[in-house]
Each structure stands twice: as C-alpha cells, then as structure tokens.
Amino acid sequence: MEDGKITTGQAASLPFVEQTVYHGRPADETGRLLKEIRTYDILDKLKIPFTRVDHQEIATVEACGELDKLLKSPLCKNLFLCNSQKTRFYLLMMPGRKRFITKEFCRQIGSPRLSFAPEEYMVKYLDITPGSVSVLGLANDTKKQVQLVIDRDILQGETVGCHPCINTSSLCIAMKDLLEKFLPYVEHDYIEVDLPWE
C-alpha cells in the first residue's frame, strides 16, 4: 500500500506522467507489468522502504538530471556485459557521469575483454529490456548467471536510484538496504571496482 505523496514539483525537461514523489508502491497497480509488481512485493517483504517517481520511458542516464533531483539520489549507469563466448555475464553499477573504459574494468575484475551483452540474455537472465537494466533484476536471476559489480563511488553513497525492472518508474532506496537485505535475499554477492573519472 502506498504511503502517499511527499513532494511535488515541476520537472520541465522530462516528460513525467506525474511530477510527484511517492513513498512505496502504487496504490493502483492497474496496467503495471508483473515484473514491476514482483519487485515491489520483494521490497515490501524485506521491509525495504523506497520513494518512487513515475514517468514516461527514459532511454539514457543523461536524460535523468531532473529525475535525480526529484528522487534526491542519482540514478546509476547500469551496464550488462558478457565475454565473447557469452558464458559469463556482469551487471555493472557505476556513476552516470563516469565514462566506461572496457580495458580498465576488465583489468580490475581479472577478465578478458568484455562487450555489451545482447538483449536476449538481458531478458533471459534478468527479465529486463534495454533502458530498464537494474540491480533489482537480479531477483529474476535464479540460476545465478550474472555477477554484480559495483563501483566504489556508488557504494559510498547513502542511497541508490534504480528502476523496478521497467523504465517508466524510478526508485530511491538506501544503499545499506540494498547490500544487507536485497542482495542476501537474491543470493548474489558483488565485486567492488574503482573506475577512473577520466
């Protein structure tokens, strides 16, 4: 059950359906996809509080400036990567303004060169489509095929912004809850990296 509105404001540069930040899940879930509802069910089960903004589809992190302000937490850049054999998969959470340097990332995790994974594997393992990639999708990775990797700057934040497996809503949750409640529940650990700002 949704706790209610906590703030309202115009976000002129983004086509929000609503310019309101809410506590918790939608009171009316009509038209919401099952994977989004499942995400709210898990967060509620784990007693993880969150704030939420509903909006039209947002395709890039660069388009999220006003959304960051409403949530009071920057959305991560989430990259879904794989090796050339498509046998090892990684979900990288990093600051949106950092540039992804493949060679440096691979060096830090001790992996051969990686590339962006095809959409079919994103759907297969995380039940997520491009633009909706989120750490919360690990709840769908029941066979543990995806290794989570988190940049140090994300880990040092008090909160993290992410999608509930669909990019028409964005959530803000406490980093502590992500690390101490959500990840143990979905039985995933993480590798820490420290990617450069260059």
Predicted regions span which residues?
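Extended, low-hydrophobicity, polar/charged segments
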Residues: 2-198
